Amino acid sequence: MDIVQILSIIVPATLVYAAPLILTALGGVFSERSGVVNIGLEGLMIIGAFTSVLFNLFFGQELGAAAPWLSLLAAMAAGALFSLIHAAAAISFRADQTVSGVAINMLALGATLFIVKLIYGKAQTDKIPEPFYKTKIPGLGDIPVLGKIFFSDVYYTSILAIALAFISWFILFKTPFGLRIRSVGEHPMAADTMGINVYKMRYIGVMISGLFGGLGGGVYASTIALDFTHSTISGQGFIALAALVFGKWHPIGALGAALFFGFAQSLSIIGSLLPLFKDIPNVYMLMAPYILTILALTGFIGRADAPKANGVPYIKGKR
């Protein structure tokens, strides 16, 4: 097996598992850059996965190929609305942001399973009729070598996730809006003095995290899980949180970290096809992403400094 064949197996599989992590981690970047810790990324992914699956089941046959894309829009809307609970608790009521995020995770899982049981009489939905399918990107898939590796067996959602990472970088670091988001996460009092509404910007940051988290959950459900159960997301939001920290709260850093974790997750699927990993028991491959997550969060891979006001409630006029 030559290097091109190996990469043509590794890269598409990595992109499949990395895409939901990229999207969810980007949401965390916006929230935490605005000064609100978001442990609730797992819950936002659960809401997104649940919404996209139900939308696809209810409307998939009528909408056809448009159903998975529209289900992602529904997932984004649901994630944004659900994130308002965390925003209100953390920003308006100045609750402990870590506790609020954990509550979001618990509420999301409990509420979605309750609704699924009401509808289906069991804790699992049917398989969605219109998932996303791997495809060859027109034109790009015909490029020698690179086309076979990157563009011949890929989901459009993977390309979308990578594109959104660069768009997020541009918004955060090259636009006035991004400057305002970052200012309320670093020096909210100075931002307030300059006329920036700290509460408004933090609400926007958390809602953007809801949009991205819902999108990440929807992508995972529409490309990998294809149904919804209590274990559909199963820690993906926490891995995305690790990618956020590992990426040092930067969109491109989060992209790189998510690709790394995506590769680790893909090994359990493609490991037996690769000469280097084929003799390693699959159980170790399943453990790999979680071990790497722990290493990243404990600072083994490098020190990461959060925005200075991250997790600190802002009280107008208090010094």
Swiss-Prot record:
It comes from Bacillus subtilis (strain 168). Pfam families: BPD_transp_2. The keyword Transmembrane applies. It is found in: Cell membrane. This is Guanosine ABC transporter permease protein NupQ. It comes from the Bacteria. Part of an ABC transporter complex involved in the uptake of guanosine. Responsible for the translocation of the substrate across the membrane. May be a nucleoside transporter of broad specificity but with various affinities for different substrates. Belongs to the binding-protein-dependent transport system permease family.
